[in-house]
Design a protein with these regions (language model features):
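N-terminal beta1-alpha1 cap of cysteine-dependent amidohydrolase-like domains
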Residues: 1-107, 117-119, 125, 129-162, ...
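Short, surface-exposed beta-strand/loop micro-motifs that present aromatic residues
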Residues: 194-201
Length: 219
């Protein structure tokens, strides 16, 4: 049986002068359970390699991780901006350029929704405390597979077809979409107004702020 090849972007770790790249197993296992063939995509600044990576893919998941550097969306870092990696940011933006040219499906998860929004010229709250309104606890201390708050889903969205008008999700983020990128629409929000899912109006590009891969074995 031919399985669609699904690319998974990586995290970085530099410990004891031994740089590493890694990905949580939940992403790999979720793709396999869904019938795909997961491929881990290492971060590189080599354009030919990035283009070759894009050519082999039938789909792309832009995974979670550390914060997107605010320089990417033309802002200075504020006091609660977390760790970031320009190497990863620039790599993912170059990869997205090639993948979008192929018009293959893209799914962004957590940091992934933020990167997609920034790539398409949106902006982020560098910390949820800057929203200037009361917000839910979005950095849960529960196990990753357990839900912590409800989202409300738009009826004309991709999520509504599988989840209905509301769902319980997990939550592990301190940043969120501020200005939505052009040509995207909001698919879901939490009760405090934080954007929890988006989709492109013309292309197969979808993204969620929560971590479905961490819950997929349980629900």
């Amino acid at each position: 049986m031919n399985r669609p090849v699904i690319g998974l972007t990586c995290n970085e770790l530099d410990k004891e002068n031994l740089p590493k790249q890694f990905i949580n197993e939940a992403y790999i296992n979720s793709v396999i359970r869904a019938g795909g063939c997961p491929i881990i995509l290492p971060i590189t600044n080599d354009f030919d390699t990035i283009q070759a990576q894009a050519k082999m893919l039938d789909g792309l998941i832009v995974t979670g991780g550390i914060d997107v550097n605010p320089m990417i969306y033309n802002e200075n870092p504020e006091s609660l901006q977390g760790d970031s990696s320009l190497d990863r940011d620039y790599y993912e933006m170059r990869l997205l350029k090639y993948v979008c040219q192929k018009q293959i499906p893209i799914l962004g998860i957590c940091r992934g929704i933020q990167m997609l929004n920034v790539y398409f010229k949106g902006s982020l709250y560098q910390d949820l405390s800057y929203c200037k309104r009361s917000v839910l606890k979005h950095a849960q201390q529960e196990k990753r597979e357990n839900p912590s708050h409800k989202i409300h889903i738009e009826k004309d969205s991709f999520l509504y077809k599988s989840l209905g008008d509301e769902a319980m999700v997990n939550s592990f983020h301190h940043q969120a979409i501020k200005d939505l990128a052009p040509n995207f629409k909001v698919s879901a929000k939490s009760s405090d107004g934080i954007i929890e899912a988006i989709e492109h109006e013309s292309f197969p590009i979808y993204a969620v702020q929560f971590h479905p891969e961490a819950m997929s074995h349980k629900y």
